[in-house]
């Protein structure tokens, strides 16, 4: 059986310190299949950086790799555009790597820690779920500031932050690729 429904990608947005990560830490103590990662630490395969997307899986026991809930903490910072001096948008590249995983594809990772004998790991991602947590401040501020004017006098209505965040909100203000945003509930 599966530990979660991989077709649902939950999204948790809230102020820093409101308990988004703490909820998952508490659940992680009870359920070993929950893995929390720090989004801004991630870098793409082949780039400099201490933690790559493939490391999420390679550091796990083989029997755990294909049945996990991966909680990406501070995902909003991971999704913000990060353009290098050569014009490469690193955020988009990382999102491309996540898209393969979220799609439930079979992915092969190469562990090159031992350069003389690199190990490969083929992972079936169908039973892996992802959760994106972060403050998503720009997205929340935009939803909060939406107003409507009626007649000659304007009345401002503050959007209920518990209201549904649309796919368009995620794309425009969360900087999330449409292919990923369409899978977020």
Segments predicted by a language model, with ranges:
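Walker A/P-loop
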Residues: 2-37
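Short, well-ordered amphipathic alpha-helices
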Residues: 1, 54-60, 98-107
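Short glycine-rich substrate-engagement loop in P-loop NTPases that contacts/grips substrate
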Residues: 35-68
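Conserved P-loop NTPase motor core
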Residues: 17, 45, 62-67, 87-94
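Canonical AAA+ ATPase core
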Residues: 13, 22-26, 31, 76-185
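Residue-level preference for the first positions of well-ordered beta-strands
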Residues: 7-11, 67-69, 129
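Surface-exposed acidic, glycine-flexible loop patches that form ligand/cofactor-binding
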Residues: 2-3, 62-63, 120-122
């Amino acid at each position: 059986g599966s530990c979660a429904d991989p077709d649902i990608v939950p999204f948790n947005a809230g102020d820093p310190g409101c308990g988004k990560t703490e909820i998952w830490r508490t659940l992680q103590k009870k359920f070993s299949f929950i893995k929390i990662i720090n989004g801004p630490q991630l870098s793409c395969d082949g780039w400099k950086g201490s933690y790559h997307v493939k490391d999420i899986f390679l550091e796990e026991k083989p029997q755990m790799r294909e049945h996990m809930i991966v909680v990406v903490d501070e995902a909003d910072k991971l999704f913000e555009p990060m353009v290098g001096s050569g014009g490469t948008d690193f955020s988009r590249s990382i999102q491309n790597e996540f898209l393969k995983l979220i799609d439930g594809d079979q992915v092969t990772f190469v562990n090159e820690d031992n350069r003389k004998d690199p190990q490969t790991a083929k992972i079936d991602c169908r039973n892996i779920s992802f959760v994106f947590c972060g403050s998503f401040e720009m997205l929340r501020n935009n939803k909060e500031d939406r107003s409507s004017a009626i007649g000659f006098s304007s009345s401002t209505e503050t959007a209920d932050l518990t209201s549904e965040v649309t796919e368009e909100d995620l794309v425009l203000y969360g900087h999330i690729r449409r292919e990923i945003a369409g899978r977020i509930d």
